[in-house]
Amino acid sequence: MNKSPIEEEFDLRKQHQKLLKKNCQKEIEDFVKCATGRTFSVTWKCRSENKTMKDCLTKAADEISEWQIRSEYNKAKQESFIGKQDEKK
């Protein structure tokens, strides 16, 4: 089944976010642990955890290029297409 360009875009962004979250799992868990059970006080009580988490995600986003993921996805898509063409011959 072929995906629409919008579905492909959604999948690529989801894959990129998954990699970012995996890379910063500890920082995210630390922030969640601090924020659990708080409402307004999260702003000042969890400031350092929030900064650490954001810094990690920013650094990971610089290292894990969304365009690299797109390139790998397109390469796999082309290989799949070529494989199907070879089967038809």
Curated annotation (Swiss-Prot):
Domain of life: Eukaryota
InterPro entries reported for this sequence: Cyt_c_biogenesis_Cmc1-like
Motif (Cx9C motif 2): 46-56
GO cellular component: mitochondrial inner membrane; mitochondrial intermembrane space; mitochondrion
Signal peptide (from-to): none
PROSITE patterns: CHCH
Disulfide bond recorded as keyword: yes
All residue ranges annotated as the CHCH domain in the record: 21-64
A GO biological process held by the record: mitochondrial cytochrome c oxidase assembly
Subcellular locations according to the entry: Mitochondrion inner membrane
Membrane topology listed for this record: Peripheral membrane protein
GO molecular function: copper ion binding
Cysteine pairs bridged by disulfides in the record: C24-C56, C34-C46
This protein's UniProt keywords: Chaperone, Disulfide bond, Membrane, Mitochondrion, Mitochondrion inner membrane, Repeat
Motif (Cx9C motif 1): 24-34
Presence of keyword Chaperone: yes
Stated family: Belongs to the CMC family.
Function per UniProt: Required for mitochondrial cytochrome c oxidase (COX) assembly and respiration.
Domain notes per entry: The twin Cx9C motifs are involved in the recognition by the mitochondrial mia40-erv1 disulfide relay system and the subsequent transfer of disulfide bonds by dithiol/disulfide exchange reactions to the newly imported protein.
UniProt protein name: COX assembly mitochondrial protein 2
